[in-house]
């Protein structure tokens, strides 16, 4: 009887030991399965309630994953930067009329509402002072353009042109037409842009102004390029504008001509040709000490290298462009540069510089465009 009891005892004891061993093995197996990332280091292995024994969260995202997502999120904003650069160029190229010099006494203080501007203009129109009326309208259009009010600027210039055409001020009429052409091109209205630029060119021919003719031909070429008539655009610059500028020894305008031609090649994705003309522009600018366009030229050179995936050279040229843009205090161009530099750093897995570039980008973008949503 005692032997039988001992046998039962050892059998039960063996079963208990076996179960404990199995539980331990299962726990060890669970340890390996429940948290492969290794972040859960303490949990109740005896839990037998509702739900899973352990809620395992995904491992924290890596620095590379966070940066990759941030760079993807800002990709959609590149068009806004390019558009802002075009507007900045448009404002810089806006010509003033002679009539504006004679209306300054009426603009102290400057009207701060649309109705105040309208009252001022209407009073001069009623008096038959059309010179003053279009001078005021042109000034108002310039102010509207700087605020990015494109439609308003176009409307004001159209009205200014109507009043200017009641006078004999041919030069001012041409200036208004030139400004209209440029704004219509920015607004992607190719037909109207071409109409007004041709009118400006015809006046330049009549007045035998070589530089104005060449400048207008450059604009006509850009209009043609945006209309995808690339052959005519190239010929207008190479065969017409450049010879005129050579005859006038207008070196600064020739730099702009090379840039314009390069931009037309970039529109066609012909980046090797674009770089050749940009190098001509850069060499001429350096030889004549015309530094105003150097930052833009260097940026365009770097951009072509970037598109060709020649990242090491592109990086070097973007950094040079950045130094030039900083010396000019051109923050919008700095933003465009750091945007591309960051993309290069990410492509090359240089995450330290990519992170620094992203922070710089965010600071500049907030300063120029407001808070980033």
Q: Language model features by range: what are they?
A:
Residues 135, 175, 215-216, 254-256, ...:
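Residue register of alpha-helical TPR repeats
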Residues 22-135:
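N-terminal leader/linker segments that initiate helical-solenoid repeat arrays
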Residues 113, 153, 193, 233-234, ...:
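Single-residue signature of alpha-solenoid repeat helices
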Residues 118-123, 158-163, 168, 198-206, ...:
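Amphipathic alpha-helical segments of tetratricopeptide repeats
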């Amino acid at each position: 009887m005692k032997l039988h009891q001992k046998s039962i005892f050892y059998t039960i004891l063996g079963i208990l030991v076996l179960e404990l061993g199995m539980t331990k093995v299962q726990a060890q197996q669970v340890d390996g399965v429940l948290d492969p990332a290794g972040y859960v280091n303490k949990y109740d292995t005896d839990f037998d309630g509702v739900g899973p024994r352990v809620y395992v969260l995904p491992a924290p995202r890596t620095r590379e994953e966070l940066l990759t997502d941030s760079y993807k999120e800002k990709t959609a904003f590149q068009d806004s930067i390019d558009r802002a650069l075009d507007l900045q160029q448009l404002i810089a190229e806006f010509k003033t009329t002679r009539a504006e010099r004679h209306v300054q006494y009426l603009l102290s203080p400057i009207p701060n509402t649309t109705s105040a501007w309208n009252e001022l203009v209407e009073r001069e129109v009623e008096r038959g002072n059309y010179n003053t009326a279009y001078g005021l309208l042109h000034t108002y259009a310039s102010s509207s353009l700087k605020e990015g009010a494109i439609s308003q600027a176009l409307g004001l210039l159209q009205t200014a042109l109507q009043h200017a055409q009641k006078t004999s001020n041919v030069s001012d009429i041409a200036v208004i037409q030139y400004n209209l052409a440029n704004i219509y091109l920015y607004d992607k209205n190719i037909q109207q842009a071409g109409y007004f630029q041709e009118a400006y060119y015809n006046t330049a021919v009549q007045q035998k102004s070589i530089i104005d003719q060449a400048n207008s031909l450059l604009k006509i070429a850009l209009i043609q390029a945006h209309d995808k008539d690339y052959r005519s655009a190239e010929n207008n610059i190479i065969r017409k504008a450049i010879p005129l500028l050579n005859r006038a020894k207008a070196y600064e305008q020739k730099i702009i001509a090379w840039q314009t031609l390069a931009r037309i090649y970039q529109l066609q994705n012909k980046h090797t040709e674009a770089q050749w003309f940009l190098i001509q522009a850069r060499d001429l600018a350096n030889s004549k000490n015309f530094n105003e366009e150097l930052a833009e030229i260097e940026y365009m050179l770097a951009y072509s290298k970037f598109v060709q995936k020649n990242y090491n050279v592109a990086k070097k040229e973007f950094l040079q462009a950045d130094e030039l843009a900083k010396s000019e205090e051109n923050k919008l161009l700095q933003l465009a540069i750091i945007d591309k530099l960051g993309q290069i750093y990410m492509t090359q897995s240089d995450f330290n510089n990519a992170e620094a570039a992203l922070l710089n980008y965010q600071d500049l973008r907030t300063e120029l465009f407001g808070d980033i949503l």
